Amino acid sequence: MKQMTFADAEYAGKRKQTRKELFLIEMDQVVPWKGLIALIEPHYPKGEGGRPAYPLMAMLRVHLMQNWFGYSDPAMEEALYETTILRPFAGLSLERIPDETTILNFRRLLEKHELAAGILAVINGYLGDRGLSLRQGTIVDATLINAPSSTKNKDGKRDPEMHQTKKGNQYYFGMKAHIGVDDESGLVHSVVGTAANVADVTQVDKLLHGKENMVGADAGYTGVEKRPEHEGREVIWQIAARRSTYNTLSKRSALYKAKRKIEKAKAQVRAKVEHPFRVIKRQFGYVKTRFRGLAKNTAQLVTLFALSNLWMARRHLLTNAGEVRL
């Protein structure tokens, strides 16, 4: 008898499915499980002596659900007991649910071996094999991620690796997520985490894969091409012009209209860099740092952007696999 898949099990005897169920069914089909298991398995404990370790596949699925749904370690343990749909996705039963310490230790294992970057590479390689490879242009941008500013914690102080910055007329405390995005597919290929007070323009060289012939960015990156780290870089810099450079022109003039047309074309290309930010903040609910320190939070951001690539490409993947279910 053919074994039922997660999706089959959820469809059996059901009249209506929740958004979370449909989301998990889609992710079950598009995540490159074999590639991710191969990445992590060499570092995963074999459970020799004492109680056997939980299956790696189960812990990986639990880890991804934490990122998708924003669960803390204790909340993830409770959710596995309380929310029926999560257990079959992870391949777990009520008789043996990993506790919050086990869930924490799995995340620490990934952090120790710096596997978040590997997760992004595996997912992007998988997408590339399915026709979503990187092209020749990169769009760069950054977004602020708030960190808890309260000192009401066991250390009695704010995270020393987070900093304050001003945007517009408002002050923010936290970090920045800087990303490099393919200009055609909109998929993230590079992620850097810094304190919030680090200038965006200083991180561009870390966001390029090196094969670009075009780099696009908003006006906040004005002058990037003059920085020493880009000396000799043969790319076309499509940086948005500051409004002050053409607002003095008559709006009826041919020059003004030409500049506006050029800026509109630039903006249409740059818009793709906003999609991953929207996915991690609105779809995955990531609006505030969840750990202390840049390293741990950056590792989570890399994982989130890797998962955002799968989310943005899911229709392409499901349609090409002939498995899309509505």
Range-by-range predicted roles:
Residues G49-R51, G70-S72, L110-E111:
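N-terminal core-binding DNA-recognition domain of tyrosine recombinases/integrases
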Residues A58-G70:
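Alpha-helical support elements that line or immediately flank enzyme active sites
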Residues M1-K34, E41-P42, T319-L326:
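Charged, often Cys/His-bearing segments associated with DNA-binding zinc-finger transcription factors
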Residues Y54-M59, A79-E82:
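Non-catalytic DNA-binding core/recognition domains of DNA-processing enzymes
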Residues P32, R51-M57, E95, A265, ...:
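Secondary-structure capping and boundary motifs in well-ordered enzyme cores
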